[in-house]
């Protein structure tokens, strides 16, 4: 039976992604000045205005939030007042206050740590038990061997399309392009086979903001030639592949002037494109003590090492936390029947080879650095520049599974 799988991506100029980029740019500036800063910042962008609100705890950092916002908007490409939103003239309203002392205490000193004697605290196994999770919740990480980066094919292709649109806009190849854009890819497969070699692209949708003077026919021709054919491997395309290019027609009004944007509204774009469950927590604007972000990264790290080790073709890792506690309350591995050992055995291996306490995650992946603005568009996963994409524990896992 044929099955269809669809994922979408949005460009850095999409209003929700712009909001994510602003929030992560502010986070990065705090971490640049003070790596232990606690940050939870949300952004709203709309016609002529950006609003930044949230909670921060920092002792030495003094961030010029207004300047950081305007610099972020400039980088994305909203540089003209006639866009209805721009870096120079749009208002920037800031309402940032101190992190709740009750939350801070639960993170600073975990429930486990508070219950230990001084002698217990000095034990090596408790070195990473000081910091508690910044919230409760469940997080998922996933990897699949259907692409070289171990990501689902539909979201991988969708991100490549939006990246290509941004490239053509910035290098001047298609000067009529504007920052706001979306792409969507539907693939078709036989049954539950997750194999790129047995996959075809059924439908591609591209909606891109554009200037006043270009025709829709010109846009269609350029999207087919310079974007789709340049990105999608020919073996995935057939004479029956459907292309919907700006299917709503004219798309001159875009970005925050066309739609209000908010931090955290593209969580499926940020992760696996709907291929697996999502715990619901957004990433952007949050420092790594927030397990919504850091534990999702770590779960991807675990899943990717499982697949890279050849222990499964697909791996889903679920981890859950209680606020103020260091140790996860649960950890689950699901390989969808593709594992070379049982899922229960894999979970045991994960617990032996990975430490999912928040402080341990931060140390292992070196997360208290200004690396987050670059995550805000085109997905947080499948990109080798990020530390959670390493497969440095694959060999140890493989050997342990054979023992």
From Swiss-Prot:
<dbReference type="InterPro" id="IPR002133">
    <property type="entry name" value="S-AdoMet_synthetase"/>
</dbReference>
<keyword id="KW-0808">Transferase</keyword>
<feature type="binding site">
    <location>
        <position position="286"/>
    </location>
    <ligand>
        <name>ATP</name>
    </ligand>
</feature>
<comment type="function">
    <text>Catalyzes the formation of S-adenosylmethionine (AdoMet) from methionine and ATP. The overall synthetic reaction is composed of two sequential steps, AdoMet formation and the subsequent tripolyphosphate hydrolysis which occurs prior to release of AdoMet from the enzyme.</text>
</comment>
<dbReference type="InterPro" id="IPR022636">
    <property type="entry name" value="S-AdoMet_synthetase_sfam"/>
</dbReference>
<keyword id="KW-0479">Metal-binding</keyword>
<keyword id="KW-0963">Cytoplasm</keyword>
<feature type="binding site">
    <location>
        <position position="16"/>
    </location>
    <ligand>
        <name>Mg(2+)</name>
    </ligand>
</feature>
<feature type="binding site">
    <location>
        <position position="42"/>
    </location>
    <ligand>
        <name>K(+)</name>
    </ligand>
</feature>
<keyword id="KW-0547">Nucleotide-binding</keyword>
<feature type="binding site" description="in other chain">
    <location>
        <position position="99"/>
    </location>
    <ligand>
        <name>L-methionine</name>
    </ligand>
</feature>
<feature type="binding site">
    <location>
        <position position="282"/>
    </location>
    <ligand>
        <name>ATP</name>
    </ligand>
</feature>
<dbReference type="GO" id="GO:0000287">
    <property type="term" value="F:magnesium ion binding"/>
</dbReference>
<feature type="binding site">
    <location>
        <position position="259"/>
    </location>
    <ligand>
        <name>L-methionine</name>
    </ligand>
</feature>
<feature type="binding site">
    <location>
        <position position="259"/>
    </location>
    <ligand>
        <name>ATP</name>
    </ligand>
</feature>
<dbReference type="InterPro" id="IPR022630">
    <property type="entry name" value="S-AdoMet_synt_C"/>
</dbReference>
<keyword id="KW-0630">Potassium</keyword>
<feature type="binding site" description="in other chain">
    <location>
        <position position="290"/>
    </location>
    <ligand>
        <name>L-methionine</name>
    </ligand>
</feature>
<keyword id="KW-0067">ATP-binding</keyword>
<feature type="binding site" description="in other chain">
    <location>
        <begin position="180"/>
        <end position="182"/>
    </location>
    <ligand>
        <name>ATP</name>
    </ligand>
</feature>
<protein>
    <recommendedName>
        <fullName>S-adenosylmethionine synthase</fullName>
        <ecNumber>2.5.1.6</ecNumber>
    </recommendedName>
</protein>
<comment type="subunit">
    <text>Homotetramer; dimer of dimers.</text>
</comment>
<dbReference type="GO" id="GO:0006556">
    <property type="term" value="P:S-adenosylmethionine biosynthetic process"/>
</dbReference>
<dbReference type="GO" id="GO:0005524">
    <property type="term" value="F:ATP binding"/>
</dbReference>
<dbReference type="GO" id="GO:0005737">
    <property type="term" value="C:cytoplasm"/>
</dbReference>
<dbReference type="Pfam" id="PF00438">
    <property type="entry name" value="S-AdoMet_synt_N"/>
</dbReference>
<feature type="binding site" description="in other chain">
    <location>
        <position position="55"/>
    </location>
    <ligand>
        <name>L-methionine</name>
    </ligand>
</feature>
<dbReference type="GO" id="GO:0006730">
    <property type="term" value="P:one-carbon metabolic process"/>
</dbReference>
<feature type="binding site" description="in other chain">
    <location>
        <begin position="250"/>
        <end position="251"/>
    </location>
    <ligand>
        <name>ATP</name>
    </ligand>
</feature>
<dbReference type="Pfam" id="PF02773">
    <property type="entry name" value="S-AdoMet_synt_C"/>
</dbReference>
<feature type="binding site" description="in other chain">
    <location>
        <begin position="265"/>
        <end position="266"/>
    </location>
    <ligand>
        <name>ATP</name>
    </ligand>
</feature>
<comment type="similarity">
    <text>Belongs to the AdoMet synthase family.</text>
</comment>
<dbReference type="Pfam" id="PF02772">
    <property type="entry name" value="S-AdoMet_synt_M"/>
</dbReference>
<dbReference type="InterPro" id="IPR022631">
    <property type="entry name" value="ADOMET_SYNTHASE_CS"/>
</dbReference>
<dbReference type="GO" id="GO:0004478">
    <property type="term" value="F:methionine adenosyltransferase activity"/>
</dbReference>
<comment type="pathway">
    <text>Amino-acid biosynthesis; S-adenosyl-L-methionine biosynthesis; S-adenosyl-L-methionine from L-methionine: step 1/1.</text>
</comment>
<keyword id="KW-0460">Magnesium</keyword>
<feature type="binding site" description="in other chain">
    <location>
        <position position="14"/>
    </location>
    <ligand>
        <name>ATP</name>
    </ligand>
</feature>
<feature type="region of interest" description="Flexible loop">
    <location>
        <begin position="99"/>
        <end position="109"/>
    </location>
</feature>
<dbReference type="InterPro" id="IPR022629">
    <property type="entry name" value="S-AdoMet_synt_central"/>
</dbReference>
<dbReference type="InterPro" id="IPR022628">
    <property type="entry name" value="S-AdoMet_synt_N"/>
</dbReference>
<keyword id="KW-0554">One-carbon metabolism</keyword>
């Amino acid at each position: 039976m044929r099955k269809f799988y669809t994922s979408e991506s949005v460009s850095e100029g999409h209003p929700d992604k712009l909001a994510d980029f602003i929030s992560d740019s502010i986070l990065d500036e705090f971490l640049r000045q003070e790596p232990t800063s606690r940050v939870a910042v949300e952004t709203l962008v709309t016609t002529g205005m950006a609003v930044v609100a949230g909670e921060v705890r920092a002792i030495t950092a003094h961030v010029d939030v207004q300047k950081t916002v305007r610099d972020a908007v400039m980088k994305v490409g909203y540089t003209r007042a006639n866009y209805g939103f721009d870096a120079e003239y749009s208002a920037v309203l800031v309402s940032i206050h101190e992190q709740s002392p009750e939350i801070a205490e639960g993170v600073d000193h975990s429930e486990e740590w508070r219950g230990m004697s001084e002698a217990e605290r000095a034990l090596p196994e408790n070195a990473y038990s000081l910091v508690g999770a910044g919230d409760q919740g469940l997080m998922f990480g996933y990897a699949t061997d259907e692409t070289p980066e171990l990501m689902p094919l539909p979201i991988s292709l969708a991100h490549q399309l939006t990246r290509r649109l941004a490239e053509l806009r910035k290098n001047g190849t298609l000067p009529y392009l504007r920052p706001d854009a979306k792409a969507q890819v539907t693939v078709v497969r036989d049954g539950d086979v997750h194999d790129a070699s047995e996959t075809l692209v059924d439908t591609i949708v591209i909606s891109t903001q554009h200037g006043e003077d270009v025709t829709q026919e010109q846009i269609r021709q350029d999207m087919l030639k310079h974007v789709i054919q340049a990105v999608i491997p020919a073996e995935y395309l057939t004479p029956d592949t459907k292309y919907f290019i700006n299917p709503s027609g004219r798309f001159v009004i875009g970005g925050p002037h066309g739609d209000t944007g908010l931090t955290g509204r593209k969580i499926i774009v940020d992760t696996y494109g709907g291929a697996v469950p999502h715990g619901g927590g957004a990433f952007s604007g949050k420092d790594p003590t927030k397990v919504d972000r850091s534990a999702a990264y770590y779960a991807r790290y675990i899943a990717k090492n499982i697949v890279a080790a050849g222990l499964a073709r697909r791996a889903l890792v679920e981890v859950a936390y209680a606020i103020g506690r260091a140790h996860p309350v649960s950890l689950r591995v699901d390989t969808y029947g593709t594992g070379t050992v049982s899922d229960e055995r894999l979970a045991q291996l994960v617990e032996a080879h990975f430490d999912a306490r928040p402080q341990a995650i931060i140390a292992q992946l070196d997360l208290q650095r200004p690396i987050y603005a670059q995550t805000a568009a085109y997905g947080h996963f499948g990109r080798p520049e990020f530390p959670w994409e390493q497969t440095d524990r694959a060999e140890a896992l493989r050997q342990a599974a054979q023992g």
